[in-house]
């Protein structure tokens, strides 16, 4: 009878330890954001754009800081000089040497309008959010979900 109790205790202990290991291995975002709607006017998320076959129309002055701009043959032209938080007054001409850009964030929309219930807390990192008056409010604080996080079944 004592052996049976010891086996049950060891089995129970192994199950509890297994659950603890499983829970600690989970990637849980503990950030709790409040649901507050309608305070942001729009968001800008600098994204990679264009290709050698489908060039973009921009110049180094108007290109976003943090994004690199390349020619059709892949030669580096410049890093963008315009900060989305404080845009520079730049000429609107297209630099014929620039074909495409590579930005740290490359998926999703560049312009988010309307923002719905997005807040600074729920907004994506690397995206800049502005009030309805066009003034910079904040940079997003949440990680952007992966493209195929929940594949269709």
Curated annotation (Swiss-Prot):
Pfam families hit by this protein: Prot_inhib_II
Gene3D superfamilies linked: 3.30.60.30
Presence of the UniProt keyword Repeat in the record: yes
Start-end of each Sequence repeat: 30-86, 87-146
Induction info: By wounding.
Marked site (Reactive bond for chymotrypsin) residue numbers: 92-93
Disulfide bonds: 33-121, 37-117, 45-127, 57-94, 60-78, 61-90, 67-103, 120-138
Keywords, ordered alphabetically: Disulfide bond, Protease inhibitor, Repeat, Serine protease inhibitor, Signal
Signal sequence, start to end: 1-25
Site (Reactive bond for trypsin): 35-36
Alphabetized GO MF terms: serine-type endopeptidase inhibitor activity
Similarity comment: Belongs to the protease inhibitor I20 (potato type II proteinase inhibitor) family.
Function: Inhibitor of trypsin and chymotrypsin.
This protein's name: Proteinase inhibitor type-2 K
Taxonomic lineage of the native organism: Eukaryota, Viridiplantae, Streptophyta, Embryophyta, Tracheophyta
Gene that this polypeptide is encoded by: PIN2K
């Amino acid at each position: 009878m004592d052996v049976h109790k010891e086996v049950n205790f060891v089995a129970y202990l192994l199950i509890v330890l297994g659950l603890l290991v499983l829970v600690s291995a989970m990637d849980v975002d503990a950030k709790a954001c409040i649901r507050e709607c309608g305070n942001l006017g729009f968001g800008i998320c600098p994204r990679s754009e264009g290709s050698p076959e489908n060039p973009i129309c921009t110049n180094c002055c108007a290109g976003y800081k943090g994004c690199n701009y390349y020619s059709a043959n892949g030669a580096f032209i410049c890093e963008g000089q315009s900060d989305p938080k404080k845009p520079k007054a730049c000429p609107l001409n297209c630099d014929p040497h620039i074909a495409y850009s590579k930005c740290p964030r490359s998926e999703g929309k560049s312009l988010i309008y309307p923002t719905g219930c997005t807040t600074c807390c729920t907004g994506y990192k690397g995206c800049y959010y502005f009030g309805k008056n066009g003034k910079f409010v904040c940079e997003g604080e949440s990680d952007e979900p992966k493209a195929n996080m929940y594949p269709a079944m």
